[in-house]
Every structure is written in structure tokens, then in C-alpha cells.
């Protein structure tokens, strides 16, 4: 993928975090009962608590704003996001699915997480993220 296309994907994923993850996280922190009612989530449900109660999505929204200015430097955050969403799907949703107990309100979350994972995997400059750093770079503050 050429550099221009990858940069557009990176910025697109940062925008998604600013306008989707950030507001969802903020709303979960400020008005959790309203968000539970909107999403149809019963209090104490593991899917809701698996979201990190809003702090994690809000953090990704804030970092997404930074990523629009510094796309390459913030790329590790998108890697972390892809990993945590993947682990959530594998560790929380998959076991529920295997038991046949995935609740209906989890479906939009599964779709959203899957789209973010795919978008991040497409956008991430893996060769840049995993490039070897010269030893002197490690010693600099």
C-alpha cells in the first residue's frame, strides 16, 4: 500500500476514534445509566464492563485527535486498540457464542469492534512499527 493511501487510512481511523470511541467513552463516564438504557444493557452485564466503562474508548478518542496531527507517532495506540478489541472478542464474546448465549445488544458492539480491528490492521504501518531502532536511539531521552 502506498504511503498516501496508508496515511489516509491512519487519519480515517483517528477520526473514527475521535467521533465514535471518544463520545461513547465520555457518555459512559458521564451518563452510564443513560448509555445502558440506550444500548439495552442490564446493570452489571459483562459486555458493558468489558468496554472498560468508558475510560478506554474516551482515551482512544483523545489520542485519535493527537493522531490526526502526528499519525506515525500515534500508530502504536491503534495497534493496542486492535489488540484489546480482538482480545475482548476472543475472551468475552467467543465463549458466550460457544455457549449460545450472546445477548442481542452485543451484536452492534461486535460489528463495531470488528470494523475497528479491520480498519486498524489496514491502516497500521507494521514495517514502521516493528523496524529495528539503532542502539543510540534507545539511549536518548
Residue ranges of predicted features:
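Membrane-interfacial, low-structure loops and terminal tails that flank and connect transmembrane helices
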Residues: 1-7, 130-141
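Membrane-helix boundary elements
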Residues: 4-47
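Physicochemical signature of membrane-embedded alpha-helices that form the seven-helix bundle of GPCRs
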Residues: 13-16, 49-52, 76-83, 108-111
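Core segments of alpha-helical transmembrane spans in multipass integral membrane proteins
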Residues: 22-23, 45-69, 82-90
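Structural signal for membrane-spanning alpha-helices in multi-pass inner-membrane proteins
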Residues: 28, 64-68, 92-96, 120-124
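Membrane-helix boundary connector in multi-pass membrane proteins
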Residues: 90-108
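Membrane-water interface at the C-terminal end of transmembrane alpha helices
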Residues: 107, 111-138
Amino acid at each position: 500500500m502506498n504511503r498516501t493511501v496508508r496515511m489516509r487510512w491512519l487519519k480515517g481511523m483517528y477520526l473514527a476514534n475521535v467521533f465514535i470511541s471518544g463520545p461513547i467513552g465520555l457518555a459512559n463516564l458521564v451518563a452510564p445509566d443513560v448509555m445502558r438504557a440506550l444500548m439495552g444493557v442490564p446493570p452489571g452485564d459483562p459486555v458493558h464492563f468489558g468496554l472498560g466503562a468508558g475510560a478506554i474508548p474516551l482515551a482512544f478518542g483523545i489520542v485519535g485527535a493527537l493522531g490526526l496531527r502526528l499519525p506515525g507517532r500515534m500508530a502504536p495506540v491503534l495497534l493496542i486498540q486492535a489488540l484489546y478489541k480482538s482480545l475482548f472478542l476472543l475472551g468475552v464474546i467467543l465463549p458466550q457464542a460457544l455457549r449460545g448465549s450472546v445477548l442481542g445488544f452485543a451484536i452492534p458492539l461486535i460489528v463495531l469492534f470488528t470494523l475497528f480491528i479491520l480498519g486498524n490492521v489496514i491502516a497500521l504501518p507494521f514495517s514502521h512499527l516493528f523496524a529495528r531502532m539503532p542502539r543510540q536511539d534507545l539511549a536518548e531521552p
